[in-house]
């Protein structure tokens, strides 16, 4: 969903890109990275999955190297990338791999992005339609009144300002 990716790119402080090692970086990944660049480019962490699908260690290392080099080319050299070797019979990933990702997330400091600090936006919890139902059934194309509940982030939001709701 391109609209969801765009909304996420506008508000994300840290992005975790999960990449399937069998397929590599797909078109949607590059589109999302482009959206992130336009909206301030937050911190991006890559996670490479399905490493257990490679039968030979040589093919695994080659795929890791190619994807890591492409990841660094798109983001920056040295960008953090983690590898998940495979799912255990219990349906979970290895604890040490998950701990490494959690440690990286906990120690990462978020940057103040100029786009977000100069534009106000709402992270909405819920949206309620306040228009009486009998008016909506009479004229389905009418303008409606809605209440948005959530958090205002960025700069001050002026009363009466028009909003874009995806």
Predicted regions and their residues:
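Conserved Switch II/interswitch segment of TRAFAC-class P-loop GTPases
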Residues: 1-2, 10-31, 41-61
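Short secondary-structure capping/turn segments at boundaries of alpha-helices and beta-strands
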Residues: 2-5, 160
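Canonical P-loop GTPase G-domain recognition
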Residues: 43-45, 52-140, 144-153, 159
């Amino acid at each position: 969903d391109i609209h969801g990716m765009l909304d996420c790119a506008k508000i994300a402080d840290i992005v975790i890109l999960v990449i399937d090692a069998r397929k590599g970086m797909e078109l949607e990944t590059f589109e999302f990275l482009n959206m992130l660049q336009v909206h301030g480019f937050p911190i991006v962490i890559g996670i490479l999955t399905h490493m257990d699908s490679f039968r030979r260690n040589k093919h695994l290392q080659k795929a890791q190297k190619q994807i890591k080099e492409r990841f660094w080319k798109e983001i920056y050299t040295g960008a953090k990338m983690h590898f998940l070797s495979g799912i255990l019979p219990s349906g979970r990933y290895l604890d040490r791999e998950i701990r490494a990702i959690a440690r990286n997330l906990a120690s990462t400091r978020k940057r103040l992005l100029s786009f977000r600090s100069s534009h106000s936006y709402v992270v909405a919890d819920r949206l309620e339609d306040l228009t009486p139902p009998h008016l909506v059934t009479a004229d389905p194309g009418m303008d409606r009144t809605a209440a948005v509940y959530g958090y205002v982030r960025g700069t001050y939001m002026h009363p009466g300002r028009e909003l874009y709701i995806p």
